[in-house]
Amino acid sequence: MLVAAVQILTGGNLEENLELAVEKIREAAENGAQLIVLPEATSQAFGAGRLDEQAQGLDGSFATTIRAVAQQLGVTVVLGMFSPADTVERDGKTINRVSNTALIAGPVVLGGYDKIHTYDAFNYKESDTVRAGEALVAFDVAGITVGVATCYDIRFPEQFKELARQGAQVIVVPTSWADGPGKLEQWRLLTAARALDSTSYIVAAGQARPGGAEMAGQDSGPTGIGHSVVVAPDGTRVVEAGYEPEIIYAEIDSDLVAQTRKALPVLEA
């Protein structure tokens, strides 16, 4: 199975983001990809306005358009969007929270994974505006079981190990990874570690770096660092993007997953 990790840079306009996503999904499908992964916050970038104002359910125009395109092309798409969740009180204010949802859309599947681990770190508190999910999600594409995680989830190895124990051979990770000192090194280490922990392929699609490579390593990139990556179950980096928008491709070898798990039976521990 050929997978594509689509690295784009989205903004605050849902319709423009949808148009960009559809364009790149079509490009990846034309190049033979069966599973196409786009970043977290594809529908609306973080820091580009209130998330609840453009949040939609899986029956909204954003998700249904992606589903229609996926059906037309015969591919499965995973991408980040925001859906309405609940209302909470924070410091005397009423906040309409959203779910940070990874939409799963294809010919035979339409669902979503709600990010379990909200990004409450580095002086940021995502849980103020985003309700944490509770359930692990996996689905099948071309006879291969695919698990789903989102961005900050990658710091929690048990989620990846449990997905693998439930049958996942590939774990996709839509991401909007903030740039800053040491963040690229952390990203590379964590993606490789989760592949080794779960003896699964990791397919991580991130937002491109605002401002491109010239801004790399600075704290001014809160929405993306680029470097989308596919990591094999033995920790080998199969392909990695740079800072700019691009699409990367890799072939998933289920035999390699089986061989790695036989040689390195960490999931049995």
PLM feature spans:
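Short hydrophobic-aromatic micro-motifs
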Residues: 36, 145-150, 172, 202-203
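CN hydrolase (nitrilase-like) catalytic-core segments centered on the catalytic cysteine
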Residues: 59-78, 155-246
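Short beta-strand scaffold segments in enzyme catalytic cores
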Residues: 79-81, 100-104, 137, 228-230, ...
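Short, acidic/polar
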Residues: 16-26, 155-161
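Extreme N-terminal starter segment of soluble prokaryotic enzymes
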Residues: 1-4
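Short polar catalytic/cofactor-binding loops
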Residues: 7-14
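Cys-nucleophile CN-hydrolase/nitrilase-fold catalytic domain and related Cys-dependent amidase chemistry
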Residues: 14, 23-106, 178-200
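Active-site catalytic loop in hydrolytic enzyme cores
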Residues: 87-166, 179-189, 193, 259-266
